[in-house]
Amino acid sequence: PGLVVTSAAVFALSACGASSLPTLSGFAAVRDQAARTEAAAAARATQLADIATDCASCASALRDAASSSQARLEALGGLWDPWGGVTPEGQSAPAAVSEAPTDVSAYVSWLARTATRDLEIAANPDKTSAEEARTLGAAALGRYASAARLAHVYGIDLEAGDDAALLINDRVNIASRQGVQTWAIDLFNESSVSPTFAPSGKDLASSAELSQAVATWDCTASSLPKAQVSAGTLSDAYNVSGELLVRVDTALRAGATDTRTSRCTLDALDGASLASNLLAADAAMLASNSADVRAAGASAALID
């Protein structure tokens, strides 16, 4: 879907005095949609945590999700505020933030779907600059990680609530005609961002970002067995190591430049640091001018 369509679907302004509001377009509209998503996500996670009285781990995960969404909202620059906090007399305020799904499985799927929505936009150099892609991509990947953590705690699949999430999306679309903004996930049913790493394209060979990512994946793969021994908490280290080596081979066969070294060292071997290093290498590809490289980075990031 084109950015024009996406921007038009970001939110509908109230019919009364709508023309008095400044017009959002381009990345400004996309950014505000992402910010509204985080605001809705934080509010719903807080509400769900308050009622999760029979599951302490669930409540804790939900509060963490709410805190993460709030942090991402701030990193995105907050909600659009054209009037500086006080709406002038006779002028219209931006539409209220629509609510996120109330059912946990639908909420988790909604988090994941809105994340891939934003990641697809970030992966398209025709829609986002390098800096815009980094900003939007960071929010999208953080939201996807929140969805994955909640799915793990609740023991459900990310896609378990897809149908319910789409139903909520349809209801919000209908309400948007009355001045409520839409989540637009229905526009991204056929996402170009794949959770399967299969890069292709003529730009891969010249991409310094992909080459650096390959080196990072390879170094992490060779360090994981040692990390498992030293940390004692990485039970899947060997499996992840094998998957990373397969990814390295896939990238090299697709044309990535090989800058691996026979010896490499990582500053930290704990799970959080290793994961952070991987995601940083993946996300760096979103700053590329090549759609092929950005798509490779987005796919790798979803996997990691």
Cite the ranges covered by each PLM segment.
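Sec-dependent N-terminal signal peptides
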Residues: 1-8
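C-terminal motif of bacterial Sec signal peptides marking the signal peptidase cleavage site
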Residues: 11-15
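All-alpha RGS (Regulator of G-protein Signaling) helical domain and cognate RGS-like helical scaffolds
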Residues: 17-304
